[in-house]
Amino acid sequence: MIIIENATKKFGTQTVLNNVSLTLEDGKIYGFVGQNGCGKTVLFKSICGFIYLDRGTITVDGKVIGKDIDIIKDAGIIIESPGFLPNYSAFKNLKFLTMIKDNIGDEQIKRTLISVGLDPESKKVVGKFSLGMRQRLGIAQAIMENPHILILDEPMNGLDKRGVEDIRKILMDLKKKGKLILLASHNPLDIDILC
């Protein structure tokens, strides 16, 4: 569960978040819509602990961001464009991320890639991926460790119709498993279908 109380954030004279208060429960998908610059990404980065609020608190599973914990740890995150090693395959990119973790094996990486529609055996390097393929890899990175919370900023940006449908299905399955999912989208249809 995430509890946001009176979250306020300014950049110079511009107030981006103004006394935002929300309670976000496990097992649900919450949609955030709005034009560019309205504060969706700032809110997501604040929840993650990447940006600190000027006023207010964000509590994740009973722990206050910036006080009890600095950065949320049990979350899969896509904020803006995910960064990858361009000269390596999708499998090698995920493998690199797991080198510091002992609990993720090659089979889990392969299953995750397949679940987002990427071929784990492909030797194609990420630098040659289309935008949609990079988005799929970003989603794979976010869900690979089976996180409790998913924070997804425009995860379907650049995907074709089939890709969008695939990702919607993945998100619905994760919701059924009790995950708390925050989804920013410019497409109201995504929000209508998923939330």
Where are each of the predicted segments found?
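The feature captures the beta-strand-to-loop junction immediately N-terminal to the Walker
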Residues: 33-35
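Conserved ABC transporter NBD signature motif
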Residues: 56-71
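Conserved ABC ATPase "signature" region
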Residues: 95, 106-121
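Hydrophobic anchor residue at the start of the ABC signature
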Residues: 139
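Catalytic Walker B motif of ABC-type/P-loop ATPase nucleotide-binding domains
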Residues: 150-154
